[in-house]
């Protein structure tokens, strides 16, 4: 992936940054692509760094993700709750599966999507092979994770758990406007939050 650089001029001269480091100075964290352990570790490290820099200032988590590994997503979710700063979530492009879950986990009142963003929720994906007892153990764990995800989505959206269970049984797509009505986000943004 090509990462652009920006040049900043200061009284002490010029300094070049990769674009993500420059955005981090403005407390912006980008979550792009599949959520795996490597991506989650990077996001968690940035959240912890920004908390250390200023624990009273909001952090902006921009999400454009098709989802990914549940445990990786949970590490981001737990860190969002662990740190003191409010984490505002903004969907750009898409937030599907674990991406949609994390979008809904932003600070209430500060969960956004751009007008043409797409949000999709569904049940966790998994598989098992091997001995019957191993398959049974894996099945129980997937069902436990599914129940946890549904409970948190219900809390975040204000929907009844039974509705979340029904809607996540299959892929459930929403426009940004529909996600507001559903309760996953609070507002569709037409203009930047910094204006």
From Swiss-Prot:
PANTHER family: ATP-DEPENDENT CLP PROTEASE PROTEOLYTIC SUBUNIT. InterPro entries: ClpP, ClpP/crotonase-like_dom_sf, ClpP/TepA, ClpP_His_AS, ClpP_Ser_AS. The keyword 4Fe-4S does not apply. It comes from the Bacteria. Cleaves peptides in various proteins in a process that requires ATP hydrolysis. Has a chymotrypsin-like activity. Plays a major role in the degradation of misfolded proteins. This is ATP-dependent Clp protease proteolytic subunit. Its EC number is 3.4.21.92. Pfam families: CLP_protease (PF00574). The gene is clpP. Its main location: cytoplasm. GO terms for biological process: protein quality control for misfolded or incompletely synthesized proteins. One of its GO terms (molecular function) is ATP-dependent peptidase activity. It is found in: Cytoplasm. It catalyses: Hydrolysis of proteins to small peptides in the presence of ATP and magnesium. alpha-casein is the usual test substrate. In the absence of ATP, only oligopeptides shorter than five residues are hydrolyzed (such as succinyl-Leu-Tyr-|-NHMec, and Leu-Tyr-Leu-|-Tyr-Trp, in which cleavage of the -Tyr-|-Leu- and -Tyr-|-Trp bonds also occurs). Fourteen ClpP subunits assemble into 2 heptameric rings which stack back to back to give a disk-like structure with a central cavity, resembling the structure of eukaryotic proteasomes.
């Amino acid at each position: 992936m090509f990462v652009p650089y920006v040049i900043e001029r200061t009284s002490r001269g010029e300094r070049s940054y990769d674009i993500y480091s420059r955005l981090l100075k403005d407390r912006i964290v980008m979550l792009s692509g599949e959520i795996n352990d490597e991506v989650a570790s990077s996001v968690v490290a940035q959240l912890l760094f920004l908390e250390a820099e200023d624990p009273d200032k909001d952090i902006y988590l921009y999400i454009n993700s098709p989802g990914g590994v549940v445990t990786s997503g949970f590490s981001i979710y737990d860190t969002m709750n662990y740190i003191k700063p409010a984490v505002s979530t903004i969907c750009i492009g898409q937030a599907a599966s674990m991406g949609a879950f994390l979008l809904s986990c932003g600070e209430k009142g500060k969960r956004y999507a751009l007008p043409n963003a797409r949000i999709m929720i569904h049940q966790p994906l998994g598989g098992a092979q091997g001995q019957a007892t191993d398959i049974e153990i894996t099945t129980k764990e997937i069902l436990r994770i599914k129940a946890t995800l549904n409970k948190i989505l219900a809390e975040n959206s204000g929907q009844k758990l039974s509705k979340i269970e029904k809607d996540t049984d299959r892929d459930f797509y929403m426009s940004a406007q529909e996600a507001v009505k559903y309760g996953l986000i609070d507002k569709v943004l037409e203009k930047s939050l910094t204006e």
